[in-house]
Amino acid sequence: MWPEVALSLLLFVLFVCGAITVGTYSYFTYVQTRLMVSIPWYYYFLIATGSLTMIFVIVAVVLYYIHLLLPLPIVLASFILFIFWLTGLVKASIELWGPMGSVNDNCVRYVYAAGFWGGRSLDTLARIQQEGMCNLWKTAFAMEMIASFVSVWICLMGWQVMSAARERYV
């Protein structure tokens, strides 16, 4: 028997993480395209991972409501999603927190260290955009970390459901 509240909450959090990641990296891809620079492989990888996560959540919810949600497929799918999320998390953390020239280094050096700015100008709009991009990177990193933890949690919850079902029939 699946714990309803925990499963619902974890699936909701996983869906939100997937949706935010898809939106974030789609926006990054759009910006890279407009800047006419190459698009890193992990942008597409994380868009695909977020999309697979949302599909997983929708399928799990449908199977739960028709009483066909089995623990073993959930454990396997959650583990695979964990590997995908962890791969994206490692690559994003290298880009965000890596050595000199990383995203965070550039944000601190060129965006946050500047003096006062404001007023009605194109420069103000550019600064708002720059801060938004810096914050979006940190948000994407946080969502990837949360999705990794939630995937493991769902995997362990499925394992507990499977163990409880075995004990009941032994």
Per-region residue spans from a language model:
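Secretory-pathway extracellular proteins and peptide precursors enriched for disulfide-bonded cysteines
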Residues: 99, 123-126
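Membrane-interface helix-loop junction between the first two transmembrane segments
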Residues: 26-36
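Juxtamembrane membrane-interface segments at transmembrane-helix boundaries in membrane proteins
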Residues: 34-46, 125-142
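Functional transmembrane-helix hotspots
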Residues: 92-112
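Intrinsically disordered terminal tails
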Residues: 1-8, 63-68, 107, 112, ...
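Membrane-interfacial segments
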Residues: 33, 100, 163-166
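Signature of small four-pass
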Residues: 4-21, 25, 39-99, 147, ...
